[in-house]
Amino acid sequence: MGRIDNTFAKLAKNKKKALVTFITAGDPDLETTESLIIDLEKAGADLIELGVPFSDPMADGPTIQLSSERALAAGTTLPKILATVKSVRRKTQIPIILMGYYNPIFLHGVERFVSDAVAAGVDGVLLVDLPPEEAGEFKAIADRSGLAVIFLLTPTSDEERIRKVAHLGSGFIYYVSVTGVTGARSSVAENVFSDVQKIRKRVTLPVVVGFGISDPAQAGSIASVADGVVVGSALVRQFEQFSGKELHTKLSTMVSALKAGIAA
């Protein structure tokens, strides 16, 4: 059993839900990314999603697009991200998932990427532009190395798509609570609760909900039906206003409040 499975099993045993925090790797630099992973865990994060910056991020709203641009301008590359994960693995066993697009992995070489990622201590990969129908080769290589491949479900996913994701996915299922791009929203869409309940009846993997969750109250309401909650844009927006110690303090405070909201 890997770190992702262990984390969800431990949380379920204690009747708790997961807080998954997303930050862009390399924004503002990879040294900050490494120290933030430790801070986020201390503040209450159960899993870390690291965004792999990409020049054409079609699924990302303006907040994460700008964050990707800052990371790329700072010289962030996939090999450097893997080196950062390898370094932080000396300090923590928190599950780390890389989230991004297929192109950087294709350019790195799929087999080489999977080997390098597992060696660095990456636990899973979520590629927003690699649907299950096209993921066969990547999934087979990842399975051999024990790298979880996480797929998305959306409000428009039909029964066939749910079945495919349930069959092919590992780690957890990421339910996108809204159609469109990433970004914090002021309220939770009504369909989320019934959709998540429907999905959970059909799958054995944990179901986490992301896109648009921005405050403890929203996180708490989502956690009432899901196995975990992902918060990204609300955290990443802080990188536009804060840096250094102020950034660490701001994110830690937000994550502590989100964790309390989930536990409420």
Swiss-Prot record:
Protein EC: 4.2.1.20
Record field: catalytic activity: (1S,2R)-1-C-(indol-3-yl)glycerol 3-phosphate + L-serine = D-glyceraldehyde 3-phosphate + L-tryptophan + H2O
InterPro entries tied to this protein: Aldolase_TIM, RibuloseP-bd_barrel, Trp_synthase_alpha_AS, Trp_synthase_suA
Pfam families: Trp_syntA
Pathway in which this enzyme or protein is active: Amino-acid biosynthesis; L-tryptophan biosynthesis; L-tryptophan from chorismate: step 5/5
PROSITE patterns listed in its UniProt record: TRP_SYNTHASE_ALPHA
Alphabetical keyword list: Amino-acid biosynthesis, Aromatic amino acid biosynthesis, Lyase, Tryptophan biosynthesis
GO cellular component term of the entry, any: cytosol
Active site: residue positions: 49 (proton acceptor), 60 (proton acceptor)
GO molecular function: tryptophan synthase activity
Its job: The alpha subunit is responsible for the aldol cleavage of indoleglycerol phosphate to indole and glyceraldehyde 3-phosphate.
Record family assignment: Belongs to the TrpA family.
Record note on quaternary structure: Tetramer of two alpha and two beta chains.
PANTHER family, per database record: TRYPTOPHAN SYNTHASE ALPHA CHAIN, CHLOROPLASTIC, TRYPTOPHAN SYNTHASE, ALPHA CHAIN
Protein name (record): Tryptophan synthase alpha chain
